[in-house]
């Protein structure tokens, strides 16, 4: 009789160990997948992320925003000419070189305005290159291999049936929690790209204010915003890399319970950090 009970207990323990290891495999596979997906998303330019959306944003910018920017540029350059004339002793000392200077500034301003999209895309091309170079290093250094979980299986096989059952329930519930946390990460990463499209659509207006000293701060702030959002992807990637390294360390500790709850804790920390980055950038720009 004891033989039968022992056999049933061993069979149940085997099922629970396999179930827990399956859940842990899912958790750590999710880490590898998340690092790869986020590296791909944050390293994609607006033109490559979604061609249809980018084409729509470009048409809106060129047909609706650019004419308004042209009117603003006309006002700015007229105001600039008046300032240049008044600065020379209220029109008593007018030199012809001033008009050549004004014509040159107007020509440069018009060229910048007509090439607004090329300038914006150049900013994101630079940030994409930096992110892609970093992504290769990060992914190669943080990938969690199946060998890391071998020590966890040994620890599980040495546990009794009761603790194994409790651990299996915990790992199952934590998988559901991880799904919700992944949705939060998805919203943050994709929300960044929507913010990029919104910034890109309004680009001609701040570009039109650059030539004048008094109104140029609007264009300068826009440039800072553009670079901040572009390189924000690198900060997101670094956060995910730190997360992956931390997960890798708890997976190698050989403590199943600590690995499960540590994974949840680090994932919550990742969501908080990504939210902090996403919120702090607009605050710093304002």
At which residue positions do the language-model features occur?
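Hydrophobic transmembrane alpha-helix segments characteristic of membrane transport
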Residues: 72-110, 202-216
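Functional transmembrane-helix hotspots
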Residues: 112-145
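Membrane-interface interhelical connector segments
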Residues: 132-174
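Membrane-interfacial helix-loop-helix connectors in multipass membrane proteins
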Residues: 149-164, 244-264
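Residue-level detector of conserved catalytic or cofactor/ligand-binding positions
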Residues: 275-286
